């Protein structure tokens, strides 16, 4: 109530004042001149620069305050687990570093001589370039005044001497101060004068004294009078509360993760303990690394498997082809022998030559063309030659017939050699003749063709494996694992018994008595003896040298024992007890001695 009354009084007083000012304005005359008031232009306030955008509370994960503006005049953020220095508190000021800035010369090249000039006096000169080794008389970057090397004037000499004297004094004063005692308190030897007026004015009125105050001289070697006592430490602050989860039992995986392997040395074992292999590997730390297997191993294995399968298929097809060729060769040989036997029977029976010639020609037409076997001209062609011999006795015809006979004799020798070969060697020879390189043939009457790159390479050597270095490894025990003349015709030529007939007496010389003698022998094994040694009738014929079998000594566990160590140890363990084998050996020795 009182407060509202006071407000009404103040409002009335203001209204009266306004009315008095209006009455005074009406009483005053009008002004003759209008005046303009000049106001200073107040500059507009600059727009406030926006401060850094600080993330709100709860959204500061991963945010790092770096500048002083990030703290916004406040303290550190406890939810940011990084080093923070609000208002640069606790931040160590780094001194001036010794790192040199990269400098370049007028050509833009790096000045490496700045390292040699670092830390020296400003006027000192360091010779750090190649031009410093060149005499001044031969240098082009030096002026004539620098070459003359004039003496300095008296003023520069005096300045240098004064600068040297001051430097020596600083060094001397430093040495003297280092020898003086330290921590000596400085005393003020000046006396202080004090005007003293006594307070009791009744005794001596207006009597004043002048007192001189000086400090008492102290002995610098006097021991300290007071002893500093350490204040006992106050009670410790209560530890901050830490929210902890309730204790739980450790699982096997937790115990395995927290397991620290024992420290086992790979070089020392002074006590000679037997350390298990798993403990040693655990101390090595290799179990902490994950093993990553490259996918290329699987790809490589798959490629090898596919290549092996293709090669096996090719080898199987090649073997089938060789078997087929051998079968055809065998069939042709049997047909040839059958024709020879039929011709011999016809000759003995006295049949006409025309009938035998027609039969021989018909049989020769049935022979397979791919075998390339010739019957030696026992057909109608030979009969025609005999008739021509009877009709014409010309020397030229005789010479031609001799040439034909020589060619046929060579063919018969080749057929005989092929008949004595095995099926495998015959198939190899046929395959070799089928795959002959024809680049060596020369076309007669034509220009020599230019050699191409394809003819310079022998395709028969592409799939052959080269010999390894040294022909065998050091630890191999297979020095005689292959026969001496394996797969070659040399063995058949060396170990074949020499025939009694010469080249001109093949097939009995072409006479009836010779053919009968040849047919009386074993017709299916041409070139072999009809009679051998006693007891060798059931032995199969060999086409090469005698092959011996390798004695392999087998240990008790089934592995190879080339030196007989296991047998020696077994005999030693038995302690010299004689076995049945030893008794048999001794019995054989006695029988031999008797």
UniProtKB/Swiss-Prot annotation:
- Gene Ontology cellular component annotations, sorted alphabetically: spliceosomal complex
Q: Which domain of life is it from?
A: Eukaryota
Q: Where is the composition biased (Acidic residues)?
A: 383-397
User: What are the entry keywords?
Assistant: mRNA processing, mRNA splicing, Nucleus, Spliceosome
Give the residue ranges for region: Disordered: 36-63, 223-254, 370-426, 498-523, 566-594
**Residue ranges under compositional bias (Pro residues)?**
44-53, 235-244
Q: Which Pfam families match?
A: SKIP_SNW
Q: Which residues form a coiled coil?
A: none
Q: How does it assemble?
A: Associated with the spliceosome.
Function, as annotated, reads: Involved in pre-mRNA splicing.
The Swiss-Prot or TrEMBL record describes its family as follows: Belongs to the SNW family.
Q: What is this protein called?
A: Pre-mRNA-processing protein 45
Q: What is the lineage of its organism?
A: Eukaryota, Fungi, Dikarya, Basidiomycota, Agaricomycotina
């Amino acid at each position: 109530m009182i407060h509202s009354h006071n407000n009404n009084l103040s409002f009335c007083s203001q209204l009266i004042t306004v009315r008095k000012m209006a009455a005074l304005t009406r009483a005053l005359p009008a002004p003759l001149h209008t005046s303009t008031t000049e106001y200073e232009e107040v500059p507009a306030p600059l727009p406030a620069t926006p401060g850094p955008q600080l993330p709100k509370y709860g959204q500061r994960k991963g945010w790092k305050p770096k500048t002083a503006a990030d703290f916004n005049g406040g303290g550190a953020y406890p939810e940011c687990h990084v080093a923070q220095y609000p208002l640069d508190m606790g931040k160590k000021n780094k001194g001036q570093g010794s790192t040199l800035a990269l400098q370049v010369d007028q050509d833009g090249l790096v000045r490496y001589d700045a390292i040699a000039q670092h830390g020296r006096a400003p006027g000192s000169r360091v010779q750090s370039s190649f031009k410093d080794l060149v005499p001044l008389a031969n240098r082009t970057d030096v002026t004539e005044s620098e070459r003359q090397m004039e003496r300095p004037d008296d003023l520069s000499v005096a300045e240098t001497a004064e600068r040297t004297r001051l430097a020596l004094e600083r060094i001397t004063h430093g040495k003297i101060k280092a020898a003086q005692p330290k921590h000596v308190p400085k005393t003020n030897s000046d006396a202080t004068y004090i005007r003293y007026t006594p307070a009791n004015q009744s005794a001596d009125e207006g009597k004043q004294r002048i007192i001189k105050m000086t400090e008492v001289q102290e002995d610098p070697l006097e021991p300290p009078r007071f002893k500093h006592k350490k204040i006992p430490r106050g009670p410790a602050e209560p530890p901050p509360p830490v929210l902890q989860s309730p204790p739980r039992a450790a699982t096997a995986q937790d115990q395995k993760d927290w397991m620290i392997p024992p420290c086992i040395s790979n070089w020392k074992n002074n006590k000679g303990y037997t350390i298990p292999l798993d403990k040693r590997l655990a101390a090595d730390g290799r179990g902490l690394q994950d093993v990553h297997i490259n996918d290329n191993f699987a790809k490589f294995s798959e490629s090898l498997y596919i290549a092996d399968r293709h090669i096996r298929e090719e080898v199987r097809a090649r073997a089938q082809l060789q078997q087929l060729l051998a079968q055809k060769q065998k069939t042709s040989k049997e047909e040839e022998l059958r024709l020879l036997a039929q011709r011999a029977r016809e000759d003995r029976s006295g049949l006409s030559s025309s009938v035998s010639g027609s039969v021989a020609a018909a049989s020769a037409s049935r022979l397979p063309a791919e075998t390339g076997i010739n019957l030696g001209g026992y057909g109608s062609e030979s009969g025609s030659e005999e008739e021509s011999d009877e009709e014409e006795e010309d020397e030229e015809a005789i010479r031609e017939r001799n040439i034909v006979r020589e060619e046929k004799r060579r063919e018969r020798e080749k057929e005989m050699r092929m008949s004595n070969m095995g099926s495998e060697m015959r198939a190899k020879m046929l395959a070799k003749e089928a795959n002959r390189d024809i680049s060596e043939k020369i076309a007669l009457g034509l220009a020599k063709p230019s050699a191409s790159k394809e003819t310079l390479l022998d395709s028969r050597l592409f799939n052959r494996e080269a010999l390894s270095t040294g022909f065998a490894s050091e630890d191999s025990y297979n020095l005689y694992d292959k026969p001496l003349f394996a797969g070659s015709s040399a063995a058949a030529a060396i170990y074949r018994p020499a025939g009694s007939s010469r080249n001109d007496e093949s097939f009995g010389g072409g006479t009836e008595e010779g053919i009968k003698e040849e047919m009386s022998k074993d017709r299916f094994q041409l070139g072999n003896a009809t009679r051998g040694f006693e007891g060798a009738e059931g032995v199969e014929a060999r086409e090469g040298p005698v092959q011996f079998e390798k004695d392999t000594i087998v240990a008790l566990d089934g592995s190879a024992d080339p030196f007989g160590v296991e047998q020696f140890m077994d005999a030693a363990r038995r302690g010299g007890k004689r076995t049945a084998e030893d008794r048999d050996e001794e019995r054989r020795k006695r029988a031999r001695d008797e």
